[in-house]
């Protein structure tokens, strides 16, 4: 039987265990789905606190959270209740680091983009590039990497596009450190090395700036991030920044605007910057489905962080049960339910903003001006 004086077990010790054990990941379901240790069972912390009989008492229980802090306290409490429970030292991040040390997937990942995911990812990426004119000759693009699956895939796709070299353009793989904890920074840099992505990292103090903001800190953080990315990209001679928003982000944004904002709008494939003259924002994953990105990640056995915010373990606004996180989750679930009735629902939502008939709209905005159907009502009648 495994014994530990401080209730801790390392990754190496766990791998060498010769007794049966249960590995329990206590993070929320979304974080677990985003990436987890092979063989782990997901029982969120709240459920264990409500009913610890969900855990076995007849064998070793190894508890895991993101960084090993929350699961450490839980392990101690469970031991007081008679469980043989230990905490995985360093949590999920320690397992990620061990993966980086043992595996190098860059070549296989690149091959998978050209072969297995040619139709579902590569072709849709290039279709967006062409259809929306996202990349043009002599562009210098800052490919913005947050550390998640979307931006890392986008970086690999841009490398593949550059390899084809049909016209001249330059790339900078830009990572902004807004005040990451050591573990988050390490995961991002390790993934970049593993995938052979030459990143340029710069630091800001955004997390300190939003730390005491009670209302919508995530929204403020996102806005500040974009501003810093524009500024740094321009300093590096770039004329565009590329963000990793995908097809599902687009249709969710359309519905969120209608249901929660009372407006019809979409997430555009490209935008002119309002504060940085000559700069543009592009979204090359605009036509790529999130399910295919997850498939690519899992097929290549890649592991990324869900949110690089240093407060994720304790910040309620990062929780799927909070207002900030739950609205998009509600929309995701709504779309999934509607798809069961109509398989075309996602495509219909996406194309709805391409098929707007202004003659059937009560009013619309163009710049700072609001146009009512009454302004042209008489002219519409004369035209019939």
Predicted regions and their residues:
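The feature marks non-catalytic terminal segments
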Residues: 302-384
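A structural preference for short, hydrophobic beta-strand core positions in alpha/beta folds
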Residues: 42, 87, 173, 201-203, ...
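Short histidine/acidic/glycine/proline-rich micro-motifs that form metal-
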Residues: 69, 175-182, 310-315
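Rhodanese-like catalytic fold shared by cysteine-dependent sulfurtransferases
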Residues: 2-22, 28-60, 66-115, 190-193
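Catalytic subdomain that performs nucleotidyl-dependent activation
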Residues: 170-171, 241, 249-330, 334
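Short phosphate-binding/catalytic loops that engage adenosine nucleotides
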Residues: 82-84, 197, 302
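ATP-dependent adenylation/nucleotidyltransferase module used to activate substrates
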Residues: 104-256, 260, 268, 291-292, ...
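A short acidic, helix-capping loop that chelates divalent metal ions and anchors anionic groups
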Residues: 32-33, 96, 208-214, 315-317
């Amino acid at each position: 039987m495994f014994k530990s004086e401080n209730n801790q077990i390392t990754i190496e010790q766990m791998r060498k265990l010769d007794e049966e054990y249960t590995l329990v990941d206590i993070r929320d379901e979304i974080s677990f789905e985003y990436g987890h240790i092979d063989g782990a069972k997901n029982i969120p912390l709240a459920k264990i606190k409500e009913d610890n009989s969900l855990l076995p008492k007849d064998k070793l229980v190894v508890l895991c959270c993101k960084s090993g802090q929350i699961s450490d306290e839980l392990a101690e409490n469970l031991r007081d209740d008679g469980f043989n429970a230990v905490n995985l030292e360093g949590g999920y991040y320690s397992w990620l680091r061990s993966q980086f040390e043992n595996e190098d997937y860059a070549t296989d990942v690149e091959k998978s983009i050209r072969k297995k995911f040619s139709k579902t990812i590569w072709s849709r990426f290039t279709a967006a590039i062409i259809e929306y004119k996202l990349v043009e000759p002599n562009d210098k693009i800052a490919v913005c990497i947050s550390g998640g699956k979307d931006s890392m895939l986008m970086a690999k796709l841009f490398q593949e596009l550059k390899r084809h070299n049909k016209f001249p353009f330059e790339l900078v793989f830009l990572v902004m450190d807004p005040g990451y904890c050591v573990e988050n920074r390490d995961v991002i840099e390790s993934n970049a090395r593993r995938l052979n992505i030459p990143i340029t990292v710069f630091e800001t103090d955004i997390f300190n700036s939003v730390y005491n903001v009670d209302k919508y800190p995530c929204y403020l953080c996102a806005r500040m991030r974009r501003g810093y990315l524009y500024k740094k990209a321009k300093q590096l001679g770039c004329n565009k920044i590329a963000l990793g928003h995908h097809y599902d982000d687009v249709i969710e944004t359309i519905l969120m605007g209608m249901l929660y904002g009372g407006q019809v709008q979409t997430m555009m494939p490209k935008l002119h910057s309002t504060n940085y003259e000559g700069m543009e924002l592009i979204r090359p994953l605009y036509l790529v489905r999130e399910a295919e990105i997850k498939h690519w990640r899992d097929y290549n056995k890649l592991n990324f962080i869900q949110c690089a915010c240093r407060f994720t373990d304790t910040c309620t606004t990062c929780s799927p049960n909070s207002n900030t996180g739950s609205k998009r989750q509600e929309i995701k679930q709504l779309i999934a339910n509607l798809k069961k009735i109509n398989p075309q629902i996602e495509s219909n939502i996406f194309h709805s903003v391409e098929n707007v008939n202004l003659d059937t709209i009560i009013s619309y905005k163009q710049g700072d001006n609001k146009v009512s159907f009454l302004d042209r009502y008489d002219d519409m009648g004369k035209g019939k």
